[in-house]
Amino acid sequence: MIYIDNRQNKIKVNEEFENKIKEIIDYALKEEKVNIDYEISVVFIDNNSIKEINKDYRNIDKATDVLSFPMLDYEEGKVFKDVYLNYEFDESDLDEGNLILGDIALSLEKAEEQSKEFGHSFLRETCYLTIHSVLHLLGYDHMEEEEKAIMRQREEEILKSFNLRR
């Protein structure tokens, strides 16, 4: 189950766009071998809102493009398919049968700015940021160069197989 809440009014959002975001989330999760019913919440916000969240949670006083709030714990260097692929979740791990993977806060305003800066479509940028955030929910990180290379490779592989290229 994917919940989308549009809390901004700077970028027009329609049902087709929301469905594309849901589709890319489903696709990325299948590519990462998430084979359990899940729940992810996505909130579309503007630069001011994401700046506040970034300051509150990361002590960084500037707007960013996307923030991820994973609900599962991962050992350093491990991702969902390493830890939970064959894991037997019990009812206490689930909410109405769904594994809560986490929340995504996406600044559509920043995504639009970056799409222009990088010379590709707004849809491609938001799909990329969504995949990036989903991978964070699944334990990927980019703090170390080796982790960053692995994460970037997975992002590009998923985008390419979903037929979205730079």
Swiss-Prot record:
Cofactor, how bound (note): Binds 1 zinc ion.
The entry's localization annotation reads: Cytoplasm
Transmembrane stretches, start-end = none
Q: Extract the coiled-coil ranges from the record.
A: none
- Please give an example of a GO cellular component term from this record: cytoplasm
Name the Pfam families for this protein.
Answer: YbeY
Needed cofactors, names only, are:
Zn(2+)
EC number in record: 3.1.-.-
Top-rank EC class of the record's enzyme: hydrolase
Q: Name one GO biological process term.
A: rRNA processing
Which family is this sequence assigned to?
Belongs to the endoribonuclease YbeY family.
- State what protein this is by name: Endoribonuclease YbeY
Organism per entry:
Clostridium botulinum (strain 657 / Type Ba4)
